[in-house]
């Protein structure tokens, strides 16, 4: 073994750095998104439980969902994750479903 082989052995392999990069860019925003949705879900169901759902309640729920998804989308965009596009699309879908059904 010469010096180059030893240095190559001591350096981290590219798969490890790609794995860390993937975790930082994708998993962290998804974790934040999960926390946002978990907190929002419990708050929404506490608010609506025991009441009849009117269009105003659906509008409030849709607005809260939309804000949570937009916040998660911003977090994903800042983290340079490609999933922010999908989060934005899902936010629009959830908003339309909550308003029309």
Curated annotation (Swiss-Prot):
Protein's membrane topology: Multi-pass membrane protein
Keywords: Endoplasmic reticulum, Membrane, Transmembrane, Transmembrane helix
Chain segments annotated as transmembrane: 20-40, 59-79, 81-101
Subcellular localization, as worded in the UniProt entry: Endoplasmic reticulum; Membrane
Pfam families: YGL204C (PF23480)
GO CC annotation, single: membrane
Name this protein carries in UniProt: Uncharacterized protein YGL204C
Annotated organism of origin: Saccharomyces cerevisiae (strain ATCC 204508 / S288c)
